């Protein structure tokens, strides 16, 4: 199943990339646990990491701080490694309201969630790839540190089928039911099976376009074939096939019965404690809820909120870390932490927030104390589990620098020859009028401007002032969701308006080559928003334009300003020297605007079957670019119904065309959600 990693790129490493690749590889081969890649905006950090993965041939997990950047990285890695397993592992909830209790108003909030089936399938595909192959890149969000089914139990539950194997049809059906597959002879969809005589068709939970046909003859597996679940066309026959459980949380029956006994013991102990403290209501509530859950587990093998009993189901002791995606990563795996200055603090904060909510539930009798062990990893547990790690950032945090010691690999030179912006410091007194004249100069030559303020009030007032003076301006604030934010950025790039005003929203991962000016108001007010890292990140937003310039408005130069200006000058000088030595003239980036949201259109093209379908699919995707996630989901459901209708009418060509369009829309939905 595994193939060697094969990097697909029209470019060869250049600038600082060859040296960065060599140093990172040497460090990994020498057994260094931590290294940092200090890569400036536009220097091709992802390309460098892709080269390291391809050269060392090691399974890799890439951690991103949010779904937007994870989707962007997934698209890029998919293009770099089209022949290998590039997987996507983020939270599969479209909406999630955890159960909670508010003592002040005596309000209990039930858990409420809506699961995205397509992302659930991608998560299952990611763990399957990690268990089966070596040529795997999993792009994950911080969801990777949350509890997942135990890999040992997951492996024990798998159903292995081989040609010539002696097995009764009923035994196969019973095993499929244990894997939580359901029988459905009418609608054949993911996670179901159907039976026709001695033929069993199984639609694997981790697959979206291939199903398995098991043909039996007198209790012997005669043939295993892979077929298209839509058209019924057989793609190939295979000598063996492994069917994975429908969910990561599936547990063998004997383990459930054992866990139930342990839950009863804990309930008895907890009841004594509550009664001793005269907490009669809490004792009654806990007994009632737990007995109901035990009844459900006995009858069905699972219950609502079964994750709260995960400690017993995975056979772990009190306080032990839960099984996570890291347990599926091979021992010689590689971890890449993207935008590490944001991702690392995020990992540290997840456990504490989760703990506070659960302690209230335990105290008031809604959950047993063991529910506290259904949690994300603590930071020290993450450190213990993490394999060899490369931190990637333009502004690494103190943690990464401390861990890496001297192993900070500089990637300052851009292959395009683009220089870091020229920085000017101007007085605060005339900042608004000065900014207005700068905006007019940029708007006249069809370039864009980003303005960052310190407060929401100032951002609103400035937006109003610029509008009154006839400028085309938009204000990007924290209430705007990810998708609307992406739409605003796209409109800025398309020239629907010239100026974007924001507070802390103009930093990581915004790729806007049209922006030639970044204005930072009140740059001399020392603090989080005007720290050295924040300033370098914000200045970097103008580093993708040939005429890039940053104006810092301040009456004095603070230590943070001095460091940010010094670092930017250092990078600029190094790039200038490289350009002179190699005769490079800086080239502006000509990145297509649809690239921001049209996640990996090449993915859809490679999946589309038949000539010309890739082009029509991509076109269909662009039409959908301005749709909200809700509208996209609605569109996906409509198309799925149309596709099934065509298949039932035996109109397989039309059904296949709709399926190709669905691939594109699902990729868009990932980028947008």
Curated annotation (Swiss-Prot):
Membrane-crossing segments per the record: none
Record PROSITE patterns: HELICASE_ATP_BIND_1 (PS51192), HELICASE_CTER (PS51194), UVR (PS50151)
GO MF terms, alphabetically ordered: ATP binding; ATP hydrolysis activity; DNA binding; excinuclease ABC activity
Domain annotation Helicase ATP-binding: ranges: 26-414
Cellular component per GO, a single term: cytoplasm
GO biological process, one term: SOS response
Compartments in which it is found: Cytoplasm
Domain UVR: 633-668
Coiled coil: none
PANTHER family according to UniProt: UVRABC SYSTEM PROTEIN B (PTHR24029:SF0)
UniProt comment concerning the protein's domains: The beta-hairpin motif is involved in DNA binding.
Complexes and interactors: Forms a heterotetramer with UvrA during the search for lesions. Interacts with UvrC in an incision complex.
Function field: The UvrABC repair system catalyzes the recognition and processing of DNA lesions. A damage recognition complex composed of 2 UvrA and 2 UvrB subunits scans DNA for abnormalities. Upon binding of the UvrA(2)B(2) complex to a putative damaged site, the DNA wraps around one UvrB monomer. DNA wrap is dependent on ATP binding by UvrB and probably causes local melting of the DNA helix, facilitating insertion of UvrB beta-hairpin between the DNA strands. Then UvrB probes one DNA strand for the presence of a lesion.
Protein's name in the database: UvrABC system protein B
Lineage start: Bacteria, Pseudomonadati, Pseudomonadota, Gammaproteobacteria, Enterobacterales
């Amino acid at each position: 199943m595994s193939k060697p990693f094969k990097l697909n790129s029209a470019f060869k490493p250049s600038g600082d990339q060859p040296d960065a690749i060599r140093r990172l590889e040497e460090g990994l081969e020498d057994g260094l646990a931590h290294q940092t890649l200090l890569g400036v905006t536009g220097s091709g950090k992802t390309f460098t990491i892709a080269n390291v993965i391809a050269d060392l041939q090691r399974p890799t997990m890439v951690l991103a701080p949010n779904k937007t950047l994870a989707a962007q990285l997934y698209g890029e890695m998919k293009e770099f490694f089209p022949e290998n397993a590039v997987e996507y592992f983020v939270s599969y909830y479209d909406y999630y309201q955890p159960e909670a209790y508010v003592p002040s108003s005596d309000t209990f909030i039930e858990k409420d969630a809506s699961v995205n089936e397509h992302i659930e399938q991608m998560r299952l595909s990611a763990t399957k790839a990690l268990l089966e192959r070596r040529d795997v890149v999993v792009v994950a969000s911080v969801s990777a540190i949350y509890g997942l089914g135990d890999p040992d139990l997951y492996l024990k539950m798998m159903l292995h089928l081989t040609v010539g194997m002696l097995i009764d049809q009923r035994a196969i059906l019973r095993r499929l039911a244990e894997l939580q597959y359901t029988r459905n002879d009418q609608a054949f969809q993911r996670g179901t099976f159907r039976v026709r005589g001695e033929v069993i068709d199984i639609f694997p939970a981790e697959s979206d376009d291939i199903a398995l046909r098991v043909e039996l003859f007198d209790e012997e597996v005669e043939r295993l074939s892979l077929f298209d679940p839509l058209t019924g066309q057989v793609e190939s026959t295979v000598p063996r096939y492994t069917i994975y459980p429908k969910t990561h949380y599936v547990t063998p029956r004997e383990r459930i019965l054992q866990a139930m006994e342990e839950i009863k013991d804990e309930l008895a102990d907890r009841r004594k404690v509550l009664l001793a403290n005269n907490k009669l209501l809490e004792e009654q509530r806990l007994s009632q809820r737990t007995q109901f859950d035990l009844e459900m587990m006995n009858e069905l093998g699972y219950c609502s909120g079964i994750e709260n009993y995960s400690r017993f189901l995975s056979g772990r002791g009190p306080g032990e870390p839960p099984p996570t995606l890291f347990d599926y990563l091979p021992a010689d795996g590689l971890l890449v932490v993207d935008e590490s200055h944001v991702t690392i603090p995020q990992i540290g904060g997840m456990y504490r927030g989760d703990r506070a909510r659960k302690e209230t539930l335990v105290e008031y009798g809604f959950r047993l104390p063991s529910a506290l062990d259904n949690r994300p990893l603590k930071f020290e547990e993450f450190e213990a589990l993490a394999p060899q790690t490369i931190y990637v950032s333009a502004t690494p945090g103190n943690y990464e620098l401390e861990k890496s010691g001297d192993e900070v690999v500089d990637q300052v030179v851009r292959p395009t020859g683009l220089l870091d912006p020229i920085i000017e410091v101007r007085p605060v007194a005339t900042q608004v009028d000065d900014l207005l004249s700068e905006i007019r100069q940029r708007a006249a030559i069809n370039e864009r401007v980003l303005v960052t303020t310190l407060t929401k009030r100032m951002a609103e007032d400035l937006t109003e002032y610029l509008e009154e003076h006839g400028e085309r301006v938009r204000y990007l604030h924290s209430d705007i969701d990810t998708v609307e934010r992406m739409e605003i950025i796209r409109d800025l790039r398309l020239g629907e308006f010239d100026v974007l005003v924001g507070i802390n929203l103009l930093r990581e991962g915004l790729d806007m080559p049209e922006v030639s000016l970044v204005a930072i108001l009140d740059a001399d007010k020392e603090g989080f928003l005007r720290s050295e890292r924040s300033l370098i990140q914000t200045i970097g937003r103008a580093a993708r334009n040939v005429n890039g310039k940053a104006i810092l408005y301040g009456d004095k130069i603070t230590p943070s300003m001095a460091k940010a200006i010094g670092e930017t000058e250092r990078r600029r000088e190094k790039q200038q020297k490289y350009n002179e030595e190699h005769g490079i003239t800086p080239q502006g980036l000509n990145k297509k605007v649809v690239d921001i949201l049209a996640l990996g259109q090449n993915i859809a093209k490679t999946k589309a079957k038949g000539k010309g379908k890739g082009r029509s699919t991509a076109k269909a995707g662009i039409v959908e670019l301005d749709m909200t996630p809700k509208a996209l989901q609605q569109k996906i459901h409509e198309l799925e119904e149309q596709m099934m209708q065509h298949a039932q009418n035996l109109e397989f060509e039309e059904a296949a065309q709709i399926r190709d369009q669905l691939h594109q829309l699902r990729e868009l939905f990932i980028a947008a959600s």
